[in-house]
């Protein structure tokens, strides 16, 4: 049956043929408009990748993963990736964005977008059951969307889905839901894979997933001990099939073992064969990469990313309410030095905008130079001729963030900044990450340039900063341009809007970002089927042990 194409696909194909967009950008945008990945890949002149042969996989065994085991209550409130890497084996998402930033249907069979991008039809996969035997259906989807949009839940999804309200979600049938958007949005399918976007069982969920861990995923929870371990057990009736035609997953069990945030014991454990896989989603992996990159007993998979470490300043608190002070501190970042010493040069320099050169919308912009004398002058103009004492909060488990802070402290001194670095355990930093006036926060990879701005640099319908707006920076012109960009499909027109967005954030924004990082997935050789993902998400249903 021939796929029904969105009206914009023809124009996208024309732009691709004229060289106005890359092959990857073409595949990405056409799949967002509902074209299957196989069809989009064929249109781009490529062969669709083949799956593993049935004879190459082996069933059974236990995978041991070193990962923090945090307290888990409401999935919509997740602000760490590591608990989602455990819970995503139990509950699932409507879509899946792969390591190449291509978005596929998952619990959805497919989707269609209207020509104006304001009506999205979500067709649910049939025959899927939660692990307690309940059918997965449209009631689960409507219930979960309403959880995301409930201000009392406090989910970051509410800010990302600002184009929706409770009246926007229509149940058409047991397996179809329509979204009626207030304004156009191209990235809806990508938003549905934001890591707090796990689908919930509307019959059993009452706010605490561990108390009622019913999901559609390939595993069930056998043991969950905060700070110790999470043990997952294979379910036998999972909906998805493996290369051998039988129900996934291949493994019998997965054990996530909390080894703290010190990298040394984890490196020793994987070298000794006590651990099979290292989860770096919430801890920096540079030390392990340096120690293990030449080790013949492990696989090191690398991914370039849009992930960064953000020097963030709360604009509702002095002295950061004065843009001259913010600009002064940003000028104290010696970016080349910070990247080289904090992250071994494994990444790209940042430009104080939360849009990466890897984002398809990115508009090339000058990288600010280290200029402590200009910074000193700005401080004097702001009323601090004798300099300024500030506290900088950082999580001690991110070694590259600690080094970033130490280099900044040294290089900001000539400008008059006297920085007191306040280190604390990562868990303590996450408890207050939106509250400290000055800190360095890790921000995960997002495939499209509008996603983080929608999460972190806008206000809600009343102008109040959204849940993840840790700096409280809300700029009317920036917000209006972002809304415009969200509804613009033409890549060149979208990039022109981003030129304005980036200029505003660089000149009067609330963050510095010295670098974008590469990431690694490290596993023992017997672990097969692991794929590098720029967000460090772990999809383990089709992983096996040789």
Regions found by a protein language model. Give the residues of each.
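N-terminal secretory signal peptides
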Residues: 1-25, 50-51
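Detector for C-terminal structural segments
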Residues: 29-50, 225-229, 234, 301, ...
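N-terminal lobe/hinge region of extracytoplasmic solute-binding protein
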Residues: 66-115, 146, 214
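Gly/Pro-rich hinge or "lid" segments in bacterial periplasmic/extracellular proteins
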Residues: 72, 98-102, 192-255, 264, ...
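Aromatic- and charge-enriched surface segment that lines or borders ligand/interaction sites
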Residues: 109-154, 172, 178, 269, ...
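Surface-exposed binding/hinge segments that line
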Residues: 123, 157-202, 218-225
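Structural transition elements
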Residues: 219, 346-381, 396-403
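Ligand-site clamp/hinge motif
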Residues: 239-288, 418-420
């Amino acid at each position: 049956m021939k796929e029904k194409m969105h009206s914009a696909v023809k124009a996208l194909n024309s732009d691709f043929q004229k060289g106005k967009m890359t092959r990857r950008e073409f595949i990405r945008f056409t799949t967002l408009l509902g074209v299957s990945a196989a069809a989009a890949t064929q249109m781009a002149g490529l062969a669709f990748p083949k799956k593993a042969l049935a004879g190459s996989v082996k069933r059974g065994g236990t995978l041991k993963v070193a990962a923090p085991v945090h307290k888990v209550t409401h999935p919509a409130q997740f602000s760490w990736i590591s608990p989602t890497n455990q819970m995503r084996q139990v509950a699932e998402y409507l879509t899946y964005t792969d390591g190449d930033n291509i978005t596929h249907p998952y619990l959805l069979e497919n989707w269609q977008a209207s020509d104006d991008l304001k009506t999205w039809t979500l067709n649910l996969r049939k025959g899927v059951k939660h692990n307690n035997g309940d059918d997965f259906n449209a009631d689960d989807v409507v219930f979960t969307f309403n959880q995301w949009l409930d201000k009392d839940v406090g989910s970051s999804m509410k800010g990302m889905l600002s184009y929706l309200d409770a009246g926007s979600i229509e149940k058409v049938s047991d397996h179809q839901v329509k979204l009626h958007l207030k304004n156009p949005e191209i990235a809806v399918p990508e938003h549905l894979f934001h890591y707090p976007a796990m689908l919930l069982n509307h019959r059993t969920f009452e706010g605490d997933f561990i108390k009622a861990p019913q999901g559609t995923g390939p595993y069930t929870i056998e043991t969950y001990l905060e700070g110790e371990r999470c043990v997952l057990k294979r379910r036998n009736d999972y909906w998805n099939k493996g290369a051998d035609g039988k129900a996934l997953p291949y493994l019998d069990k997965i054990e996530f073992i909390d080894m703290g945030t010190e990298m040394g014991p984890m490196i020793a454990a994987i070298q000794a064969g006590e651990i099979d896989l290292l989860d770096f989603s919430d801890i920096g992996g540079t030390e392990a990469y340096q120690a293990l990159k030449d080790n013949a007993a492990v696989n090191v998979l690398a991914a370039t990313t849009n992930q960064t470490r953000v020097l963030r300043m709360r604009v509702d608190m002095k002295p950061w309410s004065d843009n001259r002070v913010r600009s002064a501190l940003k000028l104290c970042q010696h970016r080349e030095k910070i990247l080289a010493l904090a992250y071994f040069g494994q990444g790209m320099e940042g430009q104080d905008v939360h849009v990466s050169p890897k984002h398809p919308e990115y508009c090339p912009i000058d990288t600010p130079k280290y200029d402590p004398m200009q910074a000193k002058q700005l401080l004097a103009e702001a009323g601090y001729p004798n300099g300024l004492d500030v506290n900088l909060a950082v999580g001690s488990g991110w070694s590259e963030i600690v080094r970033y802070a130490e280099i900044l402290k040294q290089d900001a001194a000539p400008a008059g900044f006297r920085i007191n670095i306040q280190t604390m355990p990562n868990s303590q930093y996450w408890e207050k990450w939106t509250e400290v006036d000055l800190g360095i926060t890790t921000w995960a990879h997002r495939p499209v340039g509008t996603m983080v701005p929608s999460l972190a640099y806008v206000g809600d319908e009343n102008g109040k900063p959204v849940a993840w707006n840790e700096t409280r920076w809300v700029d009317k012109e920036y917000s209006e341009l972002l809304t415009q960009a969200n509804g613009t499909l033409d890549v060149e027109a979208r990039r022109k809007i981003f030129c304005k967005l980036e200029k505003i954030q660089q000149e009067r924004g609330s963050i510095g970002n010295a670098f974008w990082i590469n990431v690694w997935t490290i596993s023992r050789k017997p672990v097969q089927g692991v794929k590098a993902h720029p967000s460090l998400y772990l999809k383990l249903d089709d992983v096996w042990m040789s």
